[in-house]
Regions:
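Surface-exposed, active-site-proximal loop segments in enzymatic domains
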Residues: 1, 12-28, 57-66
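Short, flexible loop/turn elements at secondary-structure junctions
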Residues: 10-14, 39, 50-55, 93-95
């Protein structure tokens, strides 16, 4: 695959509308079960997998399941079983990881983070959406990386004409430093 690897995230609602994707815990668990052989067959082309599945874009919001901790526990545990160790999964927010009760607690170190709003704090909406230095989220992540070797990725917001669009507001080189 030319040295490239994919970061996977599955979602039922890709339009980004503030509606549920219609997903259920049982449906998601069945789909993970169906995906497991395929994930294992192509594991060499997969860098990591974001937990996804719930809500708009698989970002764990705008869904009835966003408040169902039992479903979240089961989904993350199923994904950790689906991918062979040491492969990791990624979650968007540290508080989601902290709230998990896993089937195998020893797998917690295989849960990394997908910073879906990487701005290095250069936007007023960054706190709570970005891992901004000196915040609790940032401190938790920096402590975790001292003892765990997990995957972490980031997405710089794209150019759009909304309050979330940042292309004109951020300096990529400053953010990357």
């Amino acid at each position: 695959a030319q040295g490239y690897k994919a970061i996977l995230r599955f979602a039922y609602n890709h339009a980004g509308l503030n509606t549920s994707g219609g997903e259920s815990k049982q449906w998601i668990l069945r789909h993970i079960e169906q995906l497991t052989p395929l994930l294992n067959e192509y594991i060499g082309q997969i860098a990591t997998m974001q937990v996804g599945f719930i809500g708009a874009w698989g970002e764990w919001h705008t869904s009835p399941l966003m408040n169902d901790q039992s479903a979240k526990n089961a989904i993350v545990s199923a994904l950790l079983r689906a991918l062979p160790a040491p492969y990791c999964v990624e979650m968007r927010y540290p508080n989601h990881k902290k709230a998990l009760t896993l089937e195998q607690e020893g797998s917690r170190g295989r849960i990394g983070y997908a910073n879906d709003y990487f701005t290095a704090g250069e936007h007023p909406l960054a706190p709570g959406n970005d891992f901004v230095p000196n915040t609790d989220d940032y401190k938790q992540i920096t402590e975790e990386v001292k003892v765990n070797n997990f995957y972490m990725s980031g997405e710089i917001p794209y150019n759009e004409d909304t309050e979330w669009g940042l292309a004109a507001l951020i300096t990529p080189m400053k953010s990357l430093r």
